[in-house]
Regions:
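Sequence/structural signature of small/polar-enriched beta-strand/turn repeats
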Residues: 2, 26, 46, 64-67, ...
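Residues at secondary-structure transition points
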Residues: 23, 61-62, 83-84
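Polar low-complexity intrinsically disordered regions enriched in Ser/Thr and small residues
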Residues: 19-22, 63, 106
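Left-handed beta-helix
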Residues: 30, 35-36, 41-42, 47-48, ...
Length: 127
């Protein structure tokens, strides 16, 4: 999968789309791509070659959100957590448009279809 190439430094994050929350902030590992109007706040880890597309919201204000290597969050999706319910997305995952993921675990190489809702403590297996 080819993603738009980031500009130096290795990650392209336009000003104003990320924010710290109670000393929690984005940790970007390797090269990745984040759309200019995506909202990312709090304790978020984005692994190498991952992407977050237009109008997506990642809120790590309560627990950590991890976006695995080569995974993508498509347009309009919302990712959030609750106390004791972090959100983990494995490698090679595609999260379709307008998906709601809340405090769940998505294993490697999985497709989450357009408009899906997956809530606290749910676990979706590989493939």
């Amino acid at each position: 999968m080819d993603f738009p190439q980031p500009t130096p430094p290795q990650t392209y994050i336009p000003l104003g789309v990320t924010g710290d929350f109670e000393n929690k902030s984005l940790k970007s590992e390797g090269k990745n791509w984040i759309a200019s109007n995506a909202i990312i706040i709090g304790d978020i880890v984005i692994k190498n070659d991952a992407s977050v597309w237009f109008n997506a919201v990642l809120r790590g204000d309560i627990e950590r959100i991890i976006l695995g290597e080569g995974s993508n969050i498509q347009d309009g999706s919302v990712l959030h957590t609750d106390p004791g319910c972090p959100l983990t997305i494995g490698k090679g995952v595609t999260v379709g448009h307008m998906v709601m993921l809340h405090g769940c675990t998505i294993d490697d190489d999985t497709l989450i279809g357009i408009g899906s809702t997956i809530l606290n403590k749910a676990k979706i297996g590989k493939n």
